[in-house]
Amino acid sequence: MATNGEEQQSQAGRHQEVGHKSLLQSDALYQYILETSVYPREPECMKELREVTAKHPWNIMTTSADEGQFLNMLLKLVNAKNTMEIGVYTGYSLLATALAIPEDGKILAMDINRENYELGLPVIQKAGVAHKIDFKEGPALPVLDQMIEDGKCHGSFDFIFVDADKDNYINYHKRLIELVKVGGLIGYDNTLWNGSVVAPPDAPMRKYVRYYRDFVLELNKALAADPRIEICMLPVGDGITLCRRIQ
């Protein structure tokens, strides 16, 4: 049986506030993962972009290094070539994707803020992968609607990554399911939303966590009930749900 001192030490190693980026109970364990298998294998350009992003006031928005590593390997495993990213920020996950896809691969990248993207663009250019990226500034929904209306892009994407406005995730899914190919993947980021999905109503949460929590819960329920996809929810980063289109 644990002593009071051991219990206090255990609690001290856990995240006390809902809203922490990592979902692991122990900061030390997460640091072990980063220092043992993530940082030593992180490409120099991704390390540089991560360090640039860390200086930005909204750096909590970036994809975590372990998730970037996961995405990079996943894209190689599925041989993704034609991809899409909704929500770019400074481009850490975008760079992970660009490094993974072949030389003639393409990424349609959309974000409402070009300024953030341009913060990381010099690093992406130096890495020699900027030619793979077609960046569009502005809301993604009108672009998706146009693509569906044109009909040329139906079932054409191998992989789509969404890390944007959580209150529109359901709206994105309604459109993306038509654009991803059968057998292709859609990855929705933040689906465990800082652990708030299981938090009691009176749990301490940052305002933005509390605001978007219900939208994330709605998405998770909708994905679980969608017969057109197979799903797998992974506790990587802030939670990512992979959806494989089967019909």
Swiss-Prot record:
Residues that bind substrate: K21, D163, N194
Classification via Gene3D superfamilies: Vaccinia Virus protein VP39
Pathway: Aromatic compound metabolism; phenylpropanoid biosynthesis
Key words, A-Z: Lignin biosynthesis, Metal-binding, Methyltransferase, S-adenosyl-L-methionine, Transferase
Co-factor note (free text): Binds 1 divalent metal cation per subunit.
SUPFAM superfamilies: S-adenosyl-L-methionine-dependent methyltransferases
Enzyme Commission number(s) of this protein: 2.1.1.104
Catalytic activity: (E)-caffeoyl-CoA + S-adenosyl-L-methionine = (E)-feruloyl-CoA + S-adenosyl-L-homocysteine + H(+)
UniProt keyword Cell cycle, yes or no: no
Function (record text): Methylates caffeoyl-CoA to feruloyl-CoA and 5-hydroxyferuloyl-CoA to sinapoyl-CoA. Plays a role in the synthesis of feruloylated polysaccharides. Involved in the reinforcement of the plant cell wall. Also involved in the responding to wounding or pathogen challenge by the increased formation of cell wall-bound ferulic acid polymers.
Name of the featured protein: Caffeoyl-CoA O-methyltransferase 1
Origin species: Populus trichocarpa (Western balsam poplar)
Lineage of producing organism: Eukaryota, Viridiplantae, Streptophyta, Embryophyta, Tracheophyta
Gene: CCOAOMT1
